[in-house]
């Protein structure tokens, strides 16, 4: 069962992306490189609690 997760920019703290993840198969936090509209560059985004 996939749950919705929110991705937060590690640079500015903006939460601009939603994604889905199966928390039973992958219990660790997800980190992805995504475009941050506030920073106007690609930054590291981490899954929030």
UniProtKB/Swiss-Prot annotation:
GO biological process: translation
Alphabetical keyword list: Ribonucleoprotein, Ribosomal protein
Domain of life: Bacteria
GO function terms (MF aspect): structural constituent of ribosome
Classification via Gene3D superfamilies: Ribosomal protein L33 (2.20.28.120)
Pfam families documented for this protein: Ribosomal_L33 (PF00471)
Position of the signal peptide: none
Family annotation (InterPro entries): Ribosomal_bL33, Ribosomal_bL33_CS, Ribosomal_bL33_sf, Ribosomal_zn-bd
Keyword check for Thylakoid: no
GO annotation, cellular component aspect: cytoplasm; ribonucleoprotein complex; ribosome
Family: Belongs to the bacterial ribosomal protein bL33 family.
HAMAP family for this protein: Ribosomal_bL33
Name under which the protein is recorded: Large ribosomal subunit protein bL33A
Lineage: Bacteria, Bacillati, Bacillota, Bacilli, Lactobacillales
Recorded name of the encoding gene: rpmG1
